[in-house]
């Protein structure tokens, strides 16, 4: 399953999300959700304790002036790779 997180980690329950994910899932952070994968953040520490693949939309990182502040644990992707993720994961859950 592809989980898309578009809200700041301060306005969504990442712990609840992480109870649902498996090692076969992917989590894509976009819009304000990109703040969840900031280096040394509490939300990143939660995310690193699961086995899902982490992705972050590069355009949203740039738009928020967060270049260089995103953890290397999350892969920066563009819209083309976003489409690839939706094709790979037939089911999607917006968080």
From Swiss-Prot:
<comment type="similarity">
    <text>Belongs to the DsrH/TusB family.</text>
</comment>
<dbReference type="Pfam" id="PF04077">
    <property type="entry name" value="DsrH"/>
</dbReference>
<dbReference type="InterPro" id="IPR007215">
    <property type="entry name" value="Sulphur_relay_TusB/DsrH"/>
</dbReference>
<dbReference type="GO" id="GO:0002143">
    <property type="term" value="P:tRNA wobble position uridine thiolation"/>
</dbReference>
<comment type="function">
    <text>Part of a sulfur-relay system required for 2-thiolation of 5-methylaminomethyl-2-thiouridine (mnm(5)s(2)U) at tRNA wobble positions.</text>
</comment>
<protein>
    <recommendedName>
        <fullName>Protein TusB</fullName>
    </recommendedName>
</protein>
<keyword id="KW-0963">Cytoplasm</keyword>
<dbReference type="GO" id="GO:1990228">
    <property type="term" value="C:sulfurtransferase complex"/>
</dbReference>
<comment type="subunit">
    <text>Heterohexamer, formed by a dimer of trimers. The hexameric TusBCD complex contains 2 copies each of TusB, TusC and TusD. The TusBCD complex interacts with TusE.</text>
</comment>
<keyword id="KW-0819">tRNA processing</keyword>
<dbReference type="InterPro" id="IPR027396">
    <property type="entry name" value="DsrEFH-like"/>
</dbReference>
<dbReference type="InterPro" id="IPR023526">
    <property type="entry name" value="Sulphur_relay_TusB"/>
</dbReference>
């Amino acid at each position: 399953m592809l989980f898309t997180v578009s809200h700041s980690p301060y306005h969504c329950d990442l712990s609840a999300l992480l109870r649902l994910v498996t090692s076969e899932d992917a989590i894509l952070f976009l819009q304000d959700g990109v703040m969840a994968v900031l280096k040394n953040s509490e939300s990143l520490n939660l995310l690193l304790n699961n086995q899902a693949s982490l992705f972050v939309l590069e355009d949203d990182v740039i738009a928020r002036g967060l270049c260089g502040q995103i953890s290397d644990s999350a892969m920066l992707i563009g819209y083309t790779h976003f489409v690839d993720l939706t094709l790979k994961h037939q089911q999607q859950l917006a968080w």
